[in-house]
């Protein structure tokens, strides 16, 4: 048993070793995967919290990919998992402080997409896009508080 634990720990540690300490690489290895970013989007914009809610995302998560990305985001300290107070059979996923600090970056991605994707759904949240464009830092602080309370933000900014 002790040998297995040591091997498992070593494998886990090796798996998360960074390829370099370039700041861009660190971000990519932490959260720069399509599926990881969609999980962050669902928490921030839609207020999703459970595995089942993430599974219903329109992009169609495969169960193994979803489980893998949730575990990775927990391992790198972006998400935390706790038992649901209302239903102990479920887990609730929330952003840590490290995860909340990604909100301004996610907002910059929204601006970039709104600029270059003619069919961007950012058109549905024009008020939010304008707030981000005018003062990302201020709106990010407000949104961080909403997300801390477990609220999705899209409903507040639909055009």
Task: For each feature predicted by the language model, list its residue ranges.
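N-terminal leader segment of winged-helix/HTH proteins
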Residues: 1-31
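C-terminal regulatory/oligomerization modules of transcriptional regulators
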Residues: 1-10, 104-159
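N-terminal helix-turn-helix DNA-binding core of bacterial DNA-binding proteins
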Residues: 22-62
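Basic, amphipathic "hinge/linker" alpha-helix immediately C-terminal to the N-terminal HTH DNA-binding motif
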Residues: 32, 85-108
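Residues within the helices of the helix-turn-helix
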Residues: 52, 71, 91
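Canonical helix-turn-helix DNA-binding module
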Residues: 58-84, 88
């Amino acid at each position: 048993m002790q040998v297995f634990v040591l091997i498992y720990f070593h494998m886990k540690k090796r798996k998360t070793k960074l390829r370099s300490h370039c700041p861009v690489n660190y971000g990519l290895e932490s959260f720069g995967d399509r599926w990881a970013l969609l999980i962050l989007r669902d928490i921030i914009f839609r207020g999703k919290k459970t595995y089942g809610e993430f599974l219903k995302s329109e992009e169609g998560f495969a169960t193994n990919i979803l489980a893998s990305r949730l575990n990775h985001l927990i391992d790198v300290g972006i998400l935390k998992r706790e038992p649901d107070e209302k239903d102990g059979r479920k887990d609730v996923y929330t952003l840590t402080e490290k995860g909340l600090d990604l909100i301004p970056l996610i907002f910059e991605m929204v601006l970039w997409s709104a600029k270059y994707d003619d069919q961007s759904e950012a058109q549905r949240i024009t008020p939010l896009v304008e707030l981000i464009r005018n003062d990302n830092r201020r709106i990010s602080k407000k949104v961080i508080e909403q997300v801390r309370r477990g609220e999705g933000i899209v409903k507040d900014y639909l055009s």
